[in-house]
Swiss-Prot record:
This is Diphosphoinositol polyphosphate phosphohydrolase 3-beta. Residues 144-164 are annotated as: Disordered. Its EC number is 3.6.1.52, 3.6.1.60. It comes from Homo sapiens. SUPFAM superfamilies: Nudix (SSF55811). A motif (Nudix box) lies at residues 50-71.
Length: 164
């Protein structure tokens, strides 16, 4: 566990930062997804999510993060997958599906850092995310294709006779 000025970072036994995120959909059809502006690069879009707090369950962390970053409440659905990122940072992110039931007019990150949110068709969101956050595009590709992620490593169990 490491402390940042405004949060505590938690790590799993393998040294991965524990994160949670949600693909927030306008309806159960899952054809329009909500993205938020990056705090670091306000002209770029990302999937809302962030670090898990000590003793916090992944689903609870995902709901808290989308409330803080996107100003939405909703019905938490299935766990889409657990994605690892090893390139620039060691992250392990639990990604859930959430159907939005309420959009707040003002929310924590809109007031404090001017964060924006916008609905995208899934295909458009994938294109937007591939430039800046390819691992986030991967979440939607897995959802759309029902397959395994390609850039990060999915933590789906593999059979003993598969190639490493």
């Amino acid at each position: 566990m490491k402390c940042k000025p405004n949060q505590t970072r938690t790590y799993d036994p393998e040294g991965f930062k524990k994160r949670a995120a949600c693909l927030c959909f306008r309806s159960e059809r899952e054809d329009e997804v909500l993205l938020v502006s990056s705090s670091r690069y306000p002209d770029r879009w990302i999937v809302p999510g962030g670090g898990m707090e000590p003793e916090e369950e992944p689903g609870g962390a995902a709901v808290r993060e989308v409330y803080e970053e996107a100003g939405v409440k909703g019905k938490l659905g299935r766990l889409l997958g657990v994605f690892e990122q090893n390139q620039d940072r060691k992250h392990r992110t639990y990604v859930y599906v959430l159907t939005v039931t309420e959009l707040l007019e003002d929310w924590e990150d809109s007031v404090s850092i001017g964060r924006k949110r916008e609905w995208f068709k899934v295909e458009d969101a994938i294109k937007v995310l591939q430039c800046h956050k390819p691992v986030h595009a991967e979440y939607l590709e897995k959802l759309k294709l029902g397959g395994s992620p390609t850039n990060g490593n999915s933590m789906a169990p593999s059979s003993p006779d598969s190639d490493p």
